[in-house]
Amino acid sequence: MEEIVSQIKSQMEINFKNIEDQILMADLETVFDCENNSRYIFHYLHSMDKFFINPDNYVYEGEKLFGIPENLSVIDSARPGYEKDSSIVISREKLLDYFGYIKNKIENYFETLTAENLLQKPDNCRHTRLEMILAQFRHSMWHTGLSSAITFESKKTWNKFSGLNRY
C-alpha cells in the first residue's frame, strides 16, 4: 500500500474508533432539534456508506441487511424522504451492525486505492476520491461531536476520544 493511502487509512482507523465509542456510549433516545440521537448517528453512517467511495454507483443495503429504512437518514425537513417522528429509535445493535458493514466496505476499498486514483473522479462522479474521503472525515467527525454533546447533556459525561496519541 502506498504511503499516502496508508496514512489516510491510519487516520480512518482512528475515526472508526471514535465512531464506535460514540455508538457504544450514545444516549440514543435523547431528542435534539426534533430528532433523536440515533437518527443523527444513522445519518452520518449512511453518508459514509454512500459518499466515501462513489455516490453515483451506490445501492443502499441497510434495510435488507439490518432492517433500517434509508429515509431515516434524512434529518432535514426540507429534504425529500424526511419523516418527522422522534419516537423511531434505531437500536444500538442495528447501528453497530451497520457500522461494521461500512467499516468493512471502506477497509476493502483502501486495499484497492492508489495514490494516483486519489486525484481521479470515479465514473459519473463530480468529485475526486480524495475529495469524497476528506468530506466524509469532516462530516462524520462533525456529527460524532454533535452526538457526543447530545449524550453529554443527558449523561453528564463525555465519551472517550482517540487522536494521534492512539498509537
Regions found by a protein language model. Give the residues of each.
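Generic structural signal for secondary-structure transition and capping sites
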Residues: 17, 28, 49, 104, ...
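Conserved catalytic core of Hanks-type protein kinase domains
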Residues: 25, 43, 112
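Short, contiguous alpha-helical
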Residues: 9, 13, 28-78, 123-167
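Acidic/histidine-rich alpha-helical segments that form the ligand environment
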Residues: 77-120, 131-136
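Alpha-helical packing segments of well-folded alpha/beta enzyme cores
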Residues: 8-19, 47, 91, 95-109, ...
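N-terminal leader/capping segments at the start of a protein or of a new domain
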Residues: 1, 5-29
